[in-house]
A protein has these predicted regions:
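Residue-level marker of intrinsically disordered, low-complexity segments enriched
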Residues: 18, 233-234, 241, 264, ...
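Aromatic-Pro/Gly-enriched surface loop or interdomain linker
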Residues: 258
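Substrate-binding/catalytic cleft of secreted carbohydrate-active enzymes
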Residues: 87-219, 264-286
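Secreted/periplasmic carbohydrate-active enzymes, especially glycoside hydrolases
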Residues: 1-97, 101-102, 106-107, 153-154, ...
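Composition-driven recognition of long, low-complexity, acid-poor segments enriched in small hydrophobic
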Residues: 213, 217-254, 274
Length: 286
């Protein structure tokens, strides 16, 4: 493209390419930019140093549900851009093409992430059982989707994957990284690592368990039922007295007025805090 107008976060210039083969026709939008990562300077786009001011977000669109629409994706990106952000991370799965198109138009940088789990289950029916057979095809599909989007600046192979502390996981880390580089040599590859999760993994413990997940789900249902009971108790007609809802056997029911105990930090909040305190001394390689 002679005298091309380059793409960057402040000037998201785009071009359209139309390919015709017989009766088939496809149109692709792309941008032209030079992306360089330098350990002394950092990341540069078209020779200009860029400091990432990013956010992580999931794919849902509020009351519209877990669907992706061009208008809603662009609205989200514009709101983030107006509030000072210039980068986003797809947590924790590859983002939609509609979102990438929005990032291209708005000038928002994207780190596209692969998965939230490798071969150690975090929940009973997650992707851990299928990853070994599908990760190569999955990564190829992600690169094919992302390749022509100037907004995509790097890939992530996972989020808080404790497997990176085990020999098998270390090998898989290298395999995934090398495979991504073979598909796309223009973008770097990273991985979300949690020091304390890795420590647990290195001694054969799992951060998540099916029992823990089921208990958490049960507690959520119990809390919802208690909240419903309290709300029911508050609705009182004029002239009626307030009573607790009782069960058939006369025991005190859902309308209990006992104050709730203050919840203690659990899950990743606790582990992250502890990891910060103990440092990387407990980081092991299995």
């Amino acid at each position: 493209v002679p005298n091309a107008k380059l793409w960057d976060t402040e000037h998201p210039n785009l071009y359209t390419c139309k390919a015709i083969f017989g009766e088939d026709e496809v149109t692709e939008t792309f941008g032209i930019r030079e992306l360089i990562w330098n350990p002394q300077v950092g990341m540069t786009i078209n020779g200009e140093r860029v400091i990432l001011r990013g956010a992580c977000f999931h794919h849902d669109n509020g009351v519209l549900g877990a669907c992706t629409y061009p208008e809603t994706e662009e609205r989200k990106m514009r709101i983030l851009k107006e509030n000072g952000y210039n980068a986003v991370r797809s947590a924790h799965y590859p983002c939609s093409k509609a979102l990438l198109d929005a990032c291209d138009r708005v000038g928002m940088l994207m780190m596209d992430e692969y998965v939230d789990v490798w071969y150690i289950h975090k929940t009973k029916y997650d992707y851990a059982g299928q990853l070994a057979d599908w990760w190569k095809q999955d990564l190829k599909d992600m690169v094919d989707k992302d390749y022509n989007h100037p907004s995509v600046i790097m890939y992530s192979t996972g989020n808080e994957v404790a497997e990176t502390a085990q020999k098998k996981g270390i090998a898989l880390t290298g395999d995934m990284t090398n495979y991504l580089h073979s598909l796309d040599s223009t973008r770097p590859v990273t991985c979300g690592i949690n020091i304390f999760f890795n420590f647990l993994s290195s001694i054969g413990l799992g951060v998540y368990s099916d029992d823990k997940a089921e208990k958490s789900a049960g507690n959520a249902e119990k809390n919802a039922a208690q909240a419903a009971g309290k709300n029911e108790k508050k609705v009182v007609k004029s002239g009626e007295k307030t009573v607790n809802k009782a069960t058939e056997n006369g025991k005190k029911g859902l309308g209990s007025t006992k104050p709730e105990k203050k919840k203690k930090p659990v899950g990743s909040e606790f582990y992250n805090t502890l990891a910060c305190l103990v440092g990387d001394y407990f980081m092991k390689c299995g």
